[in-house]
C-alpha cells in the first residue's frame, strides 16, 4: 500500500519566506502535482492534458529547517517518462548563470550508460527562475535558447533547451502575450 506524504504545520503570523526561497519553491512543487503540472504546461506551452506523468527525481525531506543548506537547490522532473526538466530558482546574481545552467543541462543530458544507443537520449530542458535580469541589453520575461546554425538559424537538435524566466519582468507580461502562448485544453 502506497502512503501519501502529508505535511502540515500550525502557523500563526506572517510567513517570512516567499516562493523565491529555494526551499519554499521546491516544497510547493513537491507537495502539489497540480502546481507542478500547471507550471510545466504553461512554460512549455503544453495543454495540461498532454502531461501524463511528472516525477520529481530528487525530492527534498519536507519539514527540515528552511535555513538548512544541505539539500540540492534544483528540482529534477521526469516528464511523461521521456523528457528531463531541471527547474532552479536563483535569487542572487552570481554572474555565472550561463555557465552554471549549461553545466546543469549537460550533466542531465549525459545519461547514457556504456553500450546504450545514442537514440535513447532523452530531451533535456533547464529552466531558471532568476530574480535579476540575465542580459540587461536583451530584457525578456521568458526566453528560450537552443543550438542552431548561426548563418541560417537551422536547429541542430531539439534535445537541449535552456529557458530563463526573469522574475524582475513579471509585471511587463501583458494579457495579450499570455493569450498568444495559451494552449487549448
What residue spans do the PLM features occupy?
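Single conserved hydrophobic/aromatic residue that forms the stacking wall/gate
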Residues: 177-185
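Accessory alpha/beta interaction modules
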Residues: 1-163, 168-173
Amino acid at each position: 500500500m502506497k502512503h501519501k506524504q502529508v505535511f502540515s504545520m500550525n502557523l500563526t503570523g506572517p510567513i517570512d519566506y516567499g516562493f523565491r526561497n529555494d526551499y519554499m519553491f521546491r516544497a510547493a512543487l513537491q507537495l502539489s502535482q497540480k502546481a507542478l503540472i500547471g507550471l510545466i504546461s504553461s512554460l512549455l506551452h503544453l495543454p495540461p492534458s498532454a502531461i501524463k506523468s511528472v516525477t520529481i527525481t530528487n525530492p527534498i525531506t519536507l519539514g527540515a529547517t528552511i535555513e538548512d543548506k544541505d539539500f540540492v537547490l534544483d528540482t529534477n522532473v521526469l516528464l511523461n517518462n521521456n523528457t528531463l526538466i531541471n527547474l532552479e530558482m536563483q535569487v542572487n546574481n552570481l554572474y555565472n548563470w550561463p555557465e552554471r545552467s549549461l553545466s546543469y543541462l549537460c550533466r542531465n543530458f549525459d545519461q547514457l550508460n556504456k553500450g546504450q544507443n545514442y537514440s535513447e537520449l532523452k530531451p533535456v530542458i533547464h529552466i531558471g527562475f532568476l530574480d535579476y535580469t540575465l542580459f540587461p541589453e536583451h530584457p525578456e520575461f521568458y526566453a528560450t535558447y537552443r543550438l542552431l546554425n548561426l548563418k541560417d538559424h537551422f536547429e541542430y537538435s531539439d534535445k537541449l533547451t535552456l529557458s530563463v524566466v526573469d522574475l524582475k519582468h513579471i509585471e511587463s507580461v501583458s494579457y495579450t502575450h499570455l493569450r498568444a502562448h495559451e494552449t487549448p485544453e
